Amino acid sequence: DWDVAFIKSDYQNGKDMWLIYAADGTKLATTDNRDYAFIVAKQNNLTPRSVH
């Protein structure tokens, strides 16, 4: 399904970060706030899914 965004946590530069990827693996954005990552996905008409 192509209307999904995958949200993945990562540790970068001493901070917890949240990476947002399209279903095809394209990196869309990075943020330091998990809630904001989900908001960004929804604002772009994507269904966010958490990836571990």
What are these model-derived regions, one by one?
Residues 1-52:
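Polar low-complexity intrinsically disordered regions
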